[in-house]
Design a protein with these regions (language model features):
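ABC-family P-loop ATPase nucleotide-binding domains
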Residues: 80-135
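Conserved ABC transporter NBD signature motif
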Residues: 57-71
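Helical segment within the ABC ATPase nucleotide-binding domain
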Residues: 162-175
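The feature captures the beta-strand-to-loop junction immediately N-terminal to the Walker
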Residues: 35-37
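Helix-to-loop junction immediately C-terminal to a conserved catalytic motif
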Residues: 50
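Catalytic Walker B motif of ABC-type/P-loop ATPase nucleotide-binding domains
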Residues: 148-152, 157
């Protein structure tokens, strides 16, 4: 069974179609890149999968279920916005996640913090942007979820932090789960992807294995993306 399936899915805001008749399936055990320019529909699709938006037409299924309380138990979501309360420490955030999510693996989170040299007692308000993004990612990847939805996980951080974030994603996701990474920084994430989806103006242009693109097109995913989306 696909971990995520869209069937003729559309989402409109007024007269604007953010997603237009999207059909796709994502299988477990894959790291998938959701790639497209700004405003292409990436965040809308992720919010629909997380139950933050409802479809205008069609349907979206997570592990065979419509998004709701049951699917939230198997989906771990990283927003493209910072959401950590300033007054909380990393330890308090782990306490909250441990109370709220049955699948939160505190030992895994503590190991990642130790590896980075991050202080559990540090308050969010004293953290740099890069540190806050690392803490958010650690919390999300420390859940033993079936589907990880990561919206721009490497946006706005330095190259060394990007490398750490990608390494953290690969090291810590359940191989029976799927990871959907939304980004426009293709060259940075290409190394970790099994599959890519190209999206533009709310429509799916392509869904393909990364190896197939390299073999059939004779170019990297980043090069092919630039070719497809060139002005």
């Amino acid at each position: 069974m696909p971990i995520l399936e869209c069937r003729e899915l559309s989402k409109r805001f007024g007269k604007t179609a953010a997603l237009d008749n999207v059909s796709l399936k994502l299988e477990p055990g894959r790291v998938i890149g959701l790639l497209g320019p700004n405003g292409s529909g990436k965040t809308t699709l992720i919010k629909l999968a997380n139950g933050l938006l409802t479809p205008s037409e069609g349907e979206i299924l997570i592990d065979g279920e419509a998004p709701g309380p049951k699917t939230k138990a198997v989906v771990s979501y990283l927003s493209d916005k910072e959401y950590l309360p300033d007054w909380m420490s990393t330890r308090q955030l782990m306490d909250f996640f441990e109370d709220f999510y049955k699948d939160f693996d505190r030992q895994r989170a503590e190991e990642m913090l130790l590896r980075l040299g991050l202080d559990e007692k540090q308050k969010v308000k004293t953290m740099s942007k890069g540190t806050r993004e690392k803490v958010q990612l650690i919390l999300v990847m420390s859940r033993r979820a079936k589907l990880y939805l990561l919206d721009e996980p490497i946006g706005g951080v330095d190259p060394a932090t990007r490398d750490y974030i990608l390494d953290t994603i690969i090291r810590n996701y359940n191989p029976e789960a799927a990871v959907l990474i939304s980004t426009h920084l293709i060259a940075d994430v290409e190394q970790v992807l099994d599959e890519v989806i190209f999206i533009q103006n709310g429509q799916i242009l392509l869904q393909s294995d990364v190896d197939s693109i390299r073999e059939e097109k004779g170019m990297s995913v980043d090069q092919y993306f630039r070719e497809v989306f060139k002005c």
